[in-house]
Amino acid sequence: MPTVNQLIRKPRQAQVKRNKVPALQENPQKRGVCTRVYTTTPRKPNSALRKVAKIRLTNGFEVIGYIPGEGHNLQEHSVVMIRGGRVKDLPGVRYHIIRGVLDTQGVKNRKQRRSKYGAKRPK
């Protein structure tokens, strides 16, 4: 623990808070156009084919977004909305595509957690 004199000579430095979603530029969501839709494999110890898309945002950033849920209709030139939120086992994926908004359809036959997947209430 420093003495009062040491603190006068060299004050405490505030910790720098790093922005985890810089491409959003302090906005809750951003719109973009898919430039490439593909699958990728997660880090160890997991194994799967995760669906992701490279997205060119309206502010010029190019980011990778995760496509949640089972099945999707995205292809090149699809207009999508992204939100923050990383995928822990996919390096470089720091954004999620929002289902049920713009060109992205909601998940079919989804009964629970429907709002997260843009699914309408079943009749």
UniProtKB/Swiss-Prot annotation:
GO biological processes: translation
Pfam families linked: Ribosom_S12_S23
Family from the record: Belongs to the universal ribosomal protein uS12 family.
Keywords: Methylation, Ribonucleoprotein, Ribosomal protein, RNA-binding, rRNA-binding, tRNA-binding
UniProt name for this protein: Small ribosomal subunit protein uS12
Record InterPro entries: NA-bd_OB-fold, Ribosomal_uS12, Ribosomal_uS12_bac
Keyword rRNA-binding: yes
Gene3D superfamilies, per the entry: Nucleic acid-binding proteins
NCBIfam families (alphabetical): rpsL_bact
3-methylthioaspartic acid carried by residues: 89
Subunit annotation: Part of the 30S ribosomal subunit. Contacts proteins S8 and S17. May interact with IF1 in the 30S initiation complex.
GO CC annotations, alphabetized: small ribosomal subunit
Keyword hit for Metal-binding: no
Top-level lineage group: Bacteria
Cited PANTHER family: 30S RIBOSOMAL PROTEIN S12 FAMILY MEMBER
